[in-house]
Structures are given as structure tokens and as C-alpha cells.
From Swiss-Prot:
Superkingdom: Bacteria
InterPro entries referenced in this protein's UniProt entry, alphabetically: YjhX_toxin
Protein name: UPF0386 protein Bind_1628
Sequence similarity: Belongs to the UPF0386 family.
Source organism per UniProt: Beijerinckia indica subsp. indica (strain ATCC 9039 / DSM 1715 / NCIMB 8712)
HAMAP family: UPF0386
Amino acid sequence: MNISRSEQRVLHVLAQGGYVRHQRADNGRILDVLCFTRDGHVLADCTLEVFVKLRRKRLIESKASSPYRISDKGRRSVRAQLDNR
């Protein structure tokens, strides 16, 4: 599966324990998304377009109205990255 660089960045943050908060409009559509790292920082690369692509590919999921997290399919498709901690 082809995954863009920005999608890879977001998936990597989610694989490390991050999550995506979303805001819905009155009609139920998602208006805005914020991607948080496990440390509580906001990831600037997480735009609404990237969010929609990840959700369409079923790489992220939300269970019981909770924030979006990485799915099992997303964990299998994310490439390994070095973590400079």
C-alpha cells in the first residue's frame, strides 16, 4: 500500500501512543482534527486531508466515540523509524 510521507509521520506518532481528536459540525461531518503525541504535543503535519486519507484506508479507527487511534492494519503498514530519545 502506498503511504505518503505525511501519512507515515502521523502513523508513526499514533503507533507510539498518540491520538487524534476531532470536532464535528452540526450535520455530523468532521471539521477539524488535532493529532497529539504521547507527550501531549500537537503534530502540525496532521491535517484534515491526511486524516481523511488514513481513515479511508482504515489505518486509524475510533471505538465508542473515543479519539482516533492506529488500527491493527495501520500497525502492520507503518514503516519502522528511528526514535531519537
